[in-house]
Amino acid sequence: MKRVYSKIESIAGNVITVTAQGIKYGELAIVKAKDTSSLAEVIKLDREKVSLQVYGGTRGVSTSDEIKFLGHSMQVSFSDNLLGRIFDGSGNPRDGGPSLDDNLIEIGGPSANPTKRIVPRNMIRTGLPMIDVFNTLVESQKLPIFSVSGEPYNELLIRIALQAEVDLIILGGMGLKHDDYLTFKDSLEKGGALSRAIFFVHTANDSVVESLTVPDISLSVAEKFALKGKKVLVLLTDMTNFADAMKEISITMEQVPSNRGYPGDLYSQLAYRYEKAIDFEGAGSITILAVTTMPGDDVTHPVPDNTGYITEGQYYLKGGRIEPFGSLSRLKQMVNSRTRDDHRTIMDSMIKLYASSKESVEKKAMGFNMTKWDEKLLKYSNMFESKMMDLSVNIPLEEALDLGWSILASCFSPKETGIKTDLIEKYWPKKETY
Protein backbone atom coordinates (compact mmCIF):
# COMPACT_ATOMS: atom_id res chain seq x y z
CA MET A 1 0.00 0.00 0.00
CA LYS A 2 1.28 3.42 -0.92
CA ARG A 3 2.44 5.38 2.16
CA VAL A 4 4.15 8.37 0.49
CA TYR A 5 2.30 11.11 -1.38
CA SER A 6 3.69 14.16 -3.16
CA LYS A 7 0.62 16.30 -3.75
CA ILE A 8 -1.17 18.44 -1.17
CA GLU A 9 -4.69 19.35 -2.24
CA SER A 10 -5.09 22.38 0.04
CA ILE A 11 -3.43 24.28 2.88
CA ALA A 12 -5.61 26.15 5.40
CA GLY A 13 -4.01 27.49 8.55
CA ASN A 14 -2.09 24.60 10.11
CA VAL A 15 -4.21 22.00 8.31
CA ILE A 16 -3.33 20.30 5.02
CA THR A 17 -5.51 18.01 2.91
CA VAL A 18 -4.28 15.15 0.72
CA THR A 19 -5.90 12.36 -1.25
CA ALA A 20 -4.80 9.00 0.17
CA GLN A 21 -6.06 5.47 0.78
CA GLY A 22 -5.88 3.11 3.75
CA ILE A 23 -5.21 5.87 6.27
CA LYS A 24 -6.43 5.67 9.87
CA TYR A 25 -7.80 8.45 12.05
CA GLY A 26 -5.07 9.71 14.40
CA GLU A 27 -2.27 8.30 12.24
CA LEU A 28 0.98 10.22 12.15
CA ALA A 29 2.73 11.49 9.04
CA ILE A 30 5.90 13.40 8.25
CA VAL A 31 5.55 16.47 6.03
CA LYS A 32 8.86 17.04 4.25
CA ALA A 33 9.17 20.66 3.12
CA LYS A 34 12.11 22.15 1.27
CA ASP A 35 14.25 22.99 4.28
CA THR A 36 12.58 21.13 7.13
CA SER A 37 10.18 18.38 8.12
CA SER A 38 7.35 18.29 10.63
CA LEU A 39 5.04 15.78 12.23
CA ALA A 40 1.36 15.87 11.29
CA GLU A 41 -1.65 13.97 12.58
CA VAL A 42 -4.78 12.84 10.76
CA ILE A 43 -7.74 14.71 12.24
CA LYS A 44 -10.42 14.11 9.60
CA LEU A 45 -11.27 11.39 7.08
CA ASP A 46 -13.75 12.05 4.28
CA ARG A 47 -13.49 8.98 2.05
CA GLU A 48 -10.13 9.50 0.33
CA LYS A 49 -9.75 13.09 1.50
CA VAL A 50 -7.41 13.12 4.49
CA SER A 51 -6.95 16.24 6.64
CA LEU A 52 -3.86 16.54 8.83
CA GLN A 53 -2.85 19.12 11.41
CA VAL A 54 0.83 20.00 11.07
CA TYR A 55 2.45 20.40 14.48
CA GLY A 56 5.27 22.58 13.23
CA GLY A 57 2.88 24.86 11.36
CA THR A 58 2.47 25.13 7.59
CA ARG A 59 4.81 28.04 7.05
CA GLY A 60 7.15 27.03 4.21
CA VAL A 61 4.96 24.08 3.17
CA SER A 62 3.97 23.94 -0.52
CA THR A 63 1.46 21.79 -2.39
CA SER A 64 4.26 19.74 -3.97
CA ASP A 65 5.86 18.67 -0.69
CA GLU A 66 6.07 15.02 0.33
CA ILE A 67 3.83 13.43 2.95
CA LYS A 68 4.90 10.10 4.40
CA PHE A 69 2.36 8.23 6.56
CA LEU A 70 3.92 6.26 9.42
CA GLY A 71 1.18 3.71 10.06
CA HIS A 72 0.81 4.45 13.78
CA SER A 73 -0.50 7.17 16.08
CA MET A 74 1.72 9.40 18.21
CA GLN A 75 4.08 7.52 20.50
CA VAL A 76 6.36 8.40 23.37
CA SER A 77 9.16 6.53 25.07
CA PHE A 78 8.38 5.24 28.54
CA SER A 79 11.05 4.36 31.10
CA ASP A 80 12.70 5.75 34.22
CA ASN A 81 15.02 7.63 31.84
CA LEU A 82 12.22 10.20 31.49
CA LEU A 83 12.79 11.40 35.06
CA GLY A 84 14.43 14.81 35.26
CA ARG A 85 13.99 15.37 31.53
CA ILE A 86 12.23 18.17 29.62
CA PHE A 87 10.43 17.49 26.32
CA ASP A 88 8.25 19.43 23.90
CA GLY A 89 4.64 18.59 23.07
CA SER A 90 5.72 15.91 20.60
CA GLY A 91 8.03 14.15 23.05
CA ASN A 92 11.25 15.52 21.54
CA PRO A 93 13.99 16.67 23.96
CA ARG A 94 13.92 20.35 24.86
CA ASP A 95 16.75 20.15 27.38
CA GLY A 96 19.54 19.23 24.96
CA GLY A 97 19.64 15.65 26.20
CA PRO A 98 19.50 12.53 24.04
CA SER A 99 16.34 11.38 22.28
CA LEU A 100 14.59 8.39 23.83
CA ASP A 101 13.31 5.81 21.35
CA ASP A 102 13.02 2.65 23.43
CA ASN A 103 9.82 1.10 24.85
CA LEU A 104 7.45 3.29 22.82
CA ILE A 105 3.83 3.61 23.97
CA GLU A 106 0.91 5.17 22.11
CA ILE A 107 -0.67 8.25 23.62
CA GLY A 108 -4.32 9.20 23.83
CA GLY A 109 -5.75 5.79 24.69
CA PRO A 110 -9.10 5.27 26.45
CA SER A 111 -9.61 5.93 30.15
CA ALA A 112 -9.26 3.01 32.54
CA ASN A 113 -12.15 0.62 33.05
CA PRO A 114 -14.31 1.93 35.94
CA THR A 115 -14.13 -1.50 37.58
CA LYS A 116 -10.39 -0.96 38.03
CA ARG A 117 -10.96 2.24 40.00
CA ILE A 118 -11.16 2.33 43.78
CA VAL A 119 -12.90 4.90 45.96
CA PRO A 120 -10.59 7.87 46.76
CA ARG A 121 -9.33 7.51 50.31
CA ASN A 122 -5.90 9.12 50.70
CA MET A 123 -4.96 12.74 51.26
CA ILE A 124 -2.14 14.39 49.32
CA ARG A 125 -0.34 16.75 51.68
CA THR A 126 0.90 19.98 50.10
CA GLY A 127 2.03 22.07 53.08
CA LEU A 128 -0.46 24.79 52.09
CA PRO A 129 -3.09 25.35 54.84
CA MET A 130 -5.71 26.61 52.37
CA ILE A 131 -5.52 23.22 50.66
CA ASP A 132 -4.63 20.79 53.45
CA VAL A 133 -7.02 22.21 56.05
CA PHE A 134 -9.87 23.79 54.12
CA ASN A 135 -10.03 22.07 50.72
CA THR A 136 -8.04 18.88 51.02
CA LEU A 137 -6.52 17.46 47.85
CA VAL A 138 -7.40 13.78 47.55
CA GLU A 139 -5.45 11.15 45.67
CA SER A 140 -7.00 10.49 42.19
CA GLN A 141 -8.94 13.76 42.31
CA LYS A 142 -9.29 16.06 39.31
CA LEU A 143 -9.37 19.76 40.20
CA PRO A 144 -9.01 22.96 38.19
CA ILE A 145 -7.42 26.14 39.50
CA PHE A 146 -9.64 28.96 38.23
CA SER A 147 -7.74 32.21 37.86
CA VAL A 148 -7.30 35.32 35.75
CA SER A 149 -4.20 36.36 33.88
CA GLY A 150 -1.69 38.00 36.19
CA GLU A 151 -2.40 35.83 39.23
CA PRO A 152 0.51 33.68 40.47
CA TYR A 153 -1.02 30.38 39.36
CA ASN A 154 2.25 29.03 37.98
CA GLU A 155 3.99 29.97 41.23
CA LEU A 156 1.27 28.02 43.07
CA LEU A 157 1.94 24.97 40.89
CA ILE A 158 5.65 25.28 41.65
CA ARG A 159 4.93 25.33 45.39
CA ILE A 160 2.73 22.26 45.06
CA ALA A 161 5.33 20.47 42.92
CA LEU A 162 8.02 21.12 45.53
CA GLN A 163 5.94 20.25 48.58
CA ALA A 164 3.36 17.62 47.56
CA GLU A 165 3.89 14.19 49.09
CA VAL A 166 3.82 12.21 45.83
CA ASP A 167 6.26 9.96 44.01
CA LEU A 168 6.28 11.75 40.67
CA ILE A 169 5.38 15.14 39.20
CA ILE A 170 4.48 15.51 35.53
CA LEU A 171 4.15 19.08 34.27
CA GLY A 172 2.23 19.71 31.07
CA GLY A 173 2.70 23.30 29.90
CA MET A 174 0.57 24.77 27.10
CA GLY A 175 1.40 28.21 25.75
CA LEU A 176 3.94 28.89 28.51
CA LYS A 177 5.93 32.08 28.28
CA HIS A 178 9.62 31.29 28.02
CA ASP A 179 10.26 33.03 31.34
CA ASP A 180 7.61 30.88 33.04
CA TYR A 181 9.15 27.74 31.55
CA LEU A 182 12.58 28.72 32.91
CA THR A 183 11.05 29.54 36.30
CA PHE A 184 9.50 26.08 36.52
CA LYS A 185 12.78 24.45 35.53
CA ASP A 186 15.02 26.52 37.81
CA SER A 187 12.67 26.33 40.82
CA LEU A 188 12.33 22.56 40.73
CA GLU A 189 16.06 22.18 40.13
CA LYS A 190 16.96 24.39 43.10
CA GLY A 191 14.31 22.71 45.25
CA GLY A 192 15.70 19.26 44.49
CA ALA A 193 12.45 18.10 42.87
CA LEU A 194 13.55 17.98 39.22
CA SER A 195 14.81 14.41 39.65
CA ARG A 196 11.25 13.24 40.36
CA ALA A 197 9.67 15.40 37.64
CA ILE A 198 9.01 15.11 33.91
CA PHE A 199 8.24 18.18 31.77
CA PHE A 200 6.24 18.24 28.55
CA VAL A 201 6.32 21.90 27.58
CA HIS A 202 4.75 23.83 24.72
CA THR A 203 5.79 27.48 24.76
CA ALA A 204 4.06 30.51 23.29
CA ASN A 205 6.71 30.55 20.53
CA ASP A 206 5.83 27.04 19.35
CA SER A 207 3.15 26.14 16.84
CA VAL A 208 -0.26 26.50 18.47
CA VAL A 209 -1.49 23.06 17.46
CA GLU A 210 1.40 21.35 19.26
CA SER A 211 -0.23 22.28 22.56
CA LEU A 212 -3.04 19.82 21.76
CA THR A 213 -0.77 16.83 22.42
CA VAL A 214 0.55 18.03 25.79
CA PRO A 215 -2.29 16.74 28.04
CA ASP A 216 -2.43 13.40 26.22
CA ILE A 217 1.30 12.74 26.32
CA SER A 218 1.50 13.82 29.99
CA LEU A 219 -1.42 11.62 31.05
CA SER A 220 -0.31 8.59 29.02
CA VAL A 221 3.10 8.62 30.71
CA ALA A 222 1.40 9.22 34.08
CA GLU A 223 -0.83 6.18 33.55
CA LYS A 224 2.12 3.90 32.86
CA PHE A 225 3.93 5.07 36.00
CA ALA A 226 0.73 4.68 38.05
CA LEU A 227 0.37 1.09 36.87
CA LYS A 228 3.89 0.53 38.18
CA GLY A 229 2.72 1.64 41.64
CA LYS A 230 3.71 5.31 41.55
CA LYS A 231 1.62 8.09 43.08
CA VAL A 232 1.62 10.62 40.21
CA LEU A 233 0.54 14.27 40.34
CA VAL A 234 -0.10 15.81 36.91
CA LEU A 235 0.05 19.62 36.77
CA LEU A 236 -1.43 21.17 33.62
CA THR A 237 -1.25 24.84 32.67
CA ASP A 238 -3.16 26.35 30.94
CA MET A 239 -6.22 24.39 29.80
CA THR A 240 -7.72 27.54 28.28
CA ASN A 241 -4.77 27.66 25.87
CA PHE A 242 -5.50 24.01 25.04
CA ALA A 243 -9.14 24.86 24.31
CA ASP A 244 -8.12 27.88 22.22
CA ALA A 245 -5.93 25.61 20.08
CA MET A 246 -8.93 23.33 19.57
CA LYS A 247 -10.96 26.38 18.59
CA GLU A 248 -8.36 27.42 16.01
CA ILE A 249 -8.36 23.97 14.40
CA SER A 250 -12.15 23.86 14.44
CA ILE A 251 -12.37 27.18 12.60
CA THR A 252 -9.79 26.03 10.06
CA MET A 253 -11.81 22.86 9.46
CA GLU A 254 -14.92 25.03 8.95
CA GLN A 255 -16.82 23.19 11.65
CA VAL A 256 -20.06 24.71 12.91
CA PRO A 257 -19.02 26.73 15.99
CA SER A 258 -20.72 26.46 19.34
CA ASN A 259 -20.59 28.86 22.30
CA ARG A 260 -18.21 31.78 21.58
CA GLY A 261 -16.69 29.98 18.62
CA TYR A 262 -15.49 26.90 20.52
CA PRO A 263 -16.17 23.48 18.98
CA GLY A 264 -19.34 21.66 19.95
CA ASP A 265 -17.39 18.79 21.50
CA LEU A 266 -15.47 21.02 23.94
CA TYR A 267 -17.06 19.31 26.95
CA SER A 268 -16.20 15.83 25.65
CA GLN A 269 -12.63 16.82 24.82
CA LEU A 270 -12.04 18.24 28.30
CA ALA A 271 -13.75 15.33 30.04
CA TYR A 272 -11.68 12.83 28.08
CA ARG A 273 -8.51 14.28 29.63
CA TYR A 274 -9.79 14.83 33.17
CA GLU A 275 -11.22 11.30 33.37
CA LYS A 276 -7.67 9.96 33.30
CA ALA A 277 -7.50 10.71 37.05
CA ILE A 278 -7.66 7.37 38.84
CA ASP A 279 -6.58 5.34 41.84
CA PHE A 280 -5.72 1.83 40.60
CA GLU A 281 -6.46 -1.06 42.91
CA GLY A 282 -3.18 -2.67 43.87
CA ALA A 283 -1.12 -0.06 42.00
CA GLY A 284 -0.58 3.71 41.96
CA SER A 285 -2.72 6.73 41.15
CA ILE A 286 -3.08 9.80 38.94
CA THR A 287 -4.18 13.13 40.43
CA ILE A 288 -4.78 16.12 38.16
CA LEU A 289 -4.46 19.82 39.02
CA ALA A 290 -5.09 22.02 35.98
CA VAL A 291 -4.90 25.79 35.70
CA THR A 292 -7.85 27.23 33.78
CA THR A 293 -7.64 30.97 33.19
CA MET A 294 -10.93 32.85 32.93
CA PRO A 295 -10.89 35.64 30.31
CA GLY A 296 -12.31 38.76 31.92
CA ASP A 297 -12.73 36.86 35.22
CA ASP A 298 -15.83 35.32 33.64
CA VAL A 299 -16.66 31.95 35.18
CA THR A 300 -19.40 31.49 32.54
CA HIS A 301 -16.75 31.45 29.80
CA PRO A 302 -17.11 28.10 27.95
CA VAL A 303 -13.83 26.63 29.21
CA PRO A 304 -14.27 27.11 32.99
CA ASP A 305 -18.03 26.58 32.65
CA ASN A 306 -17.64 23.16 31.03
CA THR A 307 -14.76 22.28 33.33
CA GLY A 308 -16.92 22.84 36.40
CA TYR A 309 -19.32 20.10 35.30
CA ILE A 310 -16.48 17.59 34.89
CA THR A 311 -14.23 18.07 37.89
CA GLU A 312 -14.67 17.38 41.60
CA GLY A 313 -14.59 20.96 42.81
CA GLN A 314 -12.23 23.83 42.06
CA TYR A 315 -9.72 26.22 43.60
CA TYR A 316 -10.22 29.94 42.96
CA LEU A 317 -7.02 32.00 42.94
CA LYS A 318 -7.75 35.67 43.64
CA GLY A 319 -5.51 38.41 44.97
CA GLY A 320 -2.59 35.99 45.13
CA ARG A 321 -4.47 33.65 47.49
CA ILE A 322 -6.69 30.61 47.28
CA GLU A 323 -10.11 32.14 47.88
CA PRO A 324 -12.01 30.30 50.67
CA PHE A 325 -15.38 31.25 49.20
CA GLY A 326 -16.06 29.41 45.95
CA SER A 327 -13.15 27.02 46.33
CA LEU A 328 -14.36 23.51 46.96
CA SER A 329 -12.89 20.03 47.14
CA ARG A 330 -15.88 17.72 46.85
CA LEU A 331 -13.85 14.73 47.99
CA LYS A 332 -12.42 16.28 51.15
CA GLN A 333 -15.06 14.57 53.30
CA MET A 334 -13.55 11.25 52.20
CA VAL A 335 -10.33 11.94 54.11
CA ASN A 336 -10.62 14.76 56.66
CA SER A 337 -12.51 12.59 59.12
CA ARG A 338 -9.39 10.39 59.33
CA THR A 339 -6.71 13.06 59.75
CA ARG A 340 -7.36 14.48 63.22
CA ASP A 341 -10.58 14.67 65.22
CA ASP A 342 -10.61 18.49 65.16
CA HIS A 343 -10.00 18.86 61.40
CA ARG A 344 -13.60 19.39 60.30
CA THR A 345 -14.38 21.58 63.29
CA ILE A 346 -11.43 23.91 62.67
CA MET A 347 -12.27 24.02 58.96
CA ASP A 348 -15.92 24.93 59.51
CA SER A 349 -15.43 27.30 62.45
CA MET A 350 -12.63 29.35 60.91
CA ILE A 351 -14.43 29.80 57.59
CA LYS A 352 -17.67 30.75 59.35
CA LEU A 353 -15.90 33.43 61.41
CA TYR A 354 -13.97 34.67 58.38
CA ALA A 355 -17.25 35.08 56.49
CA SER A 356 -18.63 37.10 59.42
CA SER A 357 -15.53 39.28 59.42
CA LYS A 358 -16.27 40.41 55.87
CA GLU A 359 -19.32 42.29 57.14
CA SER A 360 -17.17 44.05 59.73
CA VAL A 361 -14.65 45.00 57.04
CA GLU A 362 -17.46 46.58 55.01
CA LYS A 363 -18.80 48.43 58.06
CA LYS A 364 -15.38 49.92 58.75
CA ALA A 365 -14.91 50.93 55.11
CA MET A 366 -18.27 52.72 55.17
CA GLY A 367 -17.49 54.58 58.40
CA PHE A 368 -19.92 52.82 60.73
CA ASN A 369 -19.24 52.57 64.46
CA MET A 370 -17.37 49.39 65.32
CA THR A 371 -18.47 47.17 68.21
CA LYS A 372 -16.08 45.08 70.31
CA TRP A 373 -17.24 42.05 68.33
CA ASP A 374 -16.41 43.85 65.09
CA GLU A 375 -12.94 44.63 66.39
CA LYS A 376 -12.40 40.98 67.27
CA LEU A 377 -13.52 39.91 63.81
CA LEU A 378 -11.19 42.44 62.14
CA LYS A 379 -8.24 41.18 64.17
CA TYR A 380 -9.17 37.62 63.30
CA SER A 381 -9.49 38.45 59.59
CA ASN A 382 -6.01 39.95 59.49
CA MET A 383 -4.46 36.99 61.29
CA PHE A 384 -6.30 34.46 59.14
CA GLU A 385 -5.20 36.10 55.91
CA SER A 386 -1.55 36.52 56.90
CA LYS A 387 -1.00 33.20 58.68
CA MET A 388 -3.32 30.84 56.79
CA MET A 389 -4.12 32.24 53.36
CA ASP A 390 -0.68 33.48 52.33
CA LEU A 391 0.80 31.14 49.71
CA SER A 392 4.26 31.45 51.28
CA VAL A 393 3.07 29.51 54.35
CA ASN A 394 4.50 25.98 54.33
CA ILE A 395 3.55 23.91 57.38
CA PRO A 396 2.33 20.33 57.96
CA LEU A 397 -1.38 19.71 58.46
CA GLU A 398 -1.09 19.08 62.20
CA GLU A 399 0.85 22.31 62.70
CA ALA A 400 -1.73 24.17 60.60
CA LEU A 401 -4.55 22.86 62.81
CA ASP A 402 -2.65 23.93 65.93
CA LEU A 403 -2.13 27.34 64.33
CA GLY A 404 -5.87 27.55 63.73
CA TRP A 405 -6.54 27.02 67.42
CA SER A 406 -3.92 29.63 68.29
CA ILE A 407 -5.53 32.21 65.98
CA LEU A 408 -8.98 31.53 67.43
CA ALA A 409 -7.68 31.81 70.99
CA SER A 410 -5.92 35.10 70.18
CA CYS A 411 -9.18 36.70 69.05
CA PHE A 412 -12.12 35.04 70.79
CA SER A 413 -13.25 33.32 73.95
CA PRO A 414 -14.08 29.61 73.68
CA LYS A 415 -17.82 30.31 73.87
CA GLU A 416 -17.65 32.82 71.00
CA THR A 417 -16.34 30.20 68.59
CA GLY A 418 -19.29 27.83 69.00
CA ILE A 419 -16.95 24.84 69.17
CA LYS A 420 -17.93 21.78 71.22
CA THR A 421 -16.66 21.64 74.79
CA ASP A 422 -14.79 18.35 74.42
CA LEU A 423 -12.63 19.75 71.60
CA ILE A 424 -12.12 23.03 73.49
CA GLU A 425 -10.83 21.10 76.50
CA LYS A 426 -8.52 19.02 74.32
CA TYR A 427 -7.04 21.62 71.96
CA TRP A 428 -7.68 25.18 73.25
CA PRO A 429 -4.31 26.87 73.97
CA LYS A 430 -3.90 27.56 77.68
CA LYS A 431 -1.77 30.71 77.48
CA GLU A 432 -3.60 32.71 74.80
CA THR A 433 -5.70 35.75 75.64
CA TYR A 434 -8.46 37.27 73.62
Swiss-Prot record:
Record family assignment: Belongs to the ATPase alpha/beta chains family.
Higher taxonomy: Bacteria, Pseudomonadati, Spirochaetota, Spirochaetia, Spirochaetales
Gene expressing this chain: atpB
Keywords: ATP synthesis, Hydrogen ion transport, Ion transport, Transport
Annotated GO MF terms: ATP binding; proton-transporting ATP synthase activity, rotational mechanism
GO biological process, one term: proton motive force-driven plasma membrane ATP synthesis
CDD domains: ATP-synt_V_A-type_beta_N, V_A-ATPase_B
Pfam families xref list: ATP-synt_ab, ATP-synt_ab_N, ATP-synt_VA_C
Function description: Produces ATP from ADP in the presence of a proton gradient across the membrane. The V-type beta chain is a regulatory subunit.
Name of this chain's protein: V-type ATP synthase beta chain
